[in-house]
Amino acid sequence: MKKKVIYSIIIVSVIIILSVAVTYAVYTFSAVVNISGTSECFDVNYVKGQDIGSDSNPAKFVLANNYTKGLSSVIKVNLKDTCTITNGTGTLYLNTDTSVTSSTILSGKVLKYQVLDGTTPVGSGIVSSAESIEIYKDIPITTTVKTITVYIWLDGNLVTEQNQNEILSSVYKGHISMDIKSGDK
């Protein structure tokens, strides 16, 4: 009879120890979370801010024959050294605010943009609508800081005597934004 009680105690103890061990193993396995590819991994610095013009200080243009005479905004982007992923891919957008931007400047098709990756031109076009425009895509993002400059300017070659005063009194407000995805799977 004593042996039965001792065996019962040993069996119950083994069951309890196994239950605790299995529970601990399951908890430990599910508690390990490897965060990778989230926004914490990417460092995006809008050097001059995201806005090109603002409600209190809307951008006013002068006629120019190239982008260097226009307004600009700079973005510095890279992958943080502390991340477990090795690369990412970004897309840069130009978003026009219709509540402030003159329709004349858009319909005249004289407002242009130029995108530089460092000193290399990578995108250009005409801002002719108030929608979000994809101005640079498939941007490789690594731990090396990438400097991207966006210029907006009025192309003086496209302005006529008939619309010059109206265009020069026009206002533009927009901002740049970037969408980044992890390159690691």
Where do the PLM segments sit?
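C-terminal, structured domain-capping segment
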Residues: 71-88, 93, 135-185
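Polar low-complexity intrinsically disordered regions enriched in Ser/Thr and small residues
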Residues: 40, 52, 56, 73, ...
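Signature of Gram-negative chaperone-usher
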Residues: 1-12, 21-27, 51, 101-157
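Surface-exposed interaction patch
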Residues: 18-19, 28, 66-122
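Solvent-exposed, conformationally flexible loop/turn segments
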Residues: 39, 58-72, 130-132, 136-145
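Generic "edge-of-domain/loop-turn" microfeature
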Residues: 32, 42-44, 49-51, 68, ...
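Short, polar/proline-rich extracytoplasmic segments that appear immediately after membrane translocation
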Residues: 2-67, 170-172, 181-185
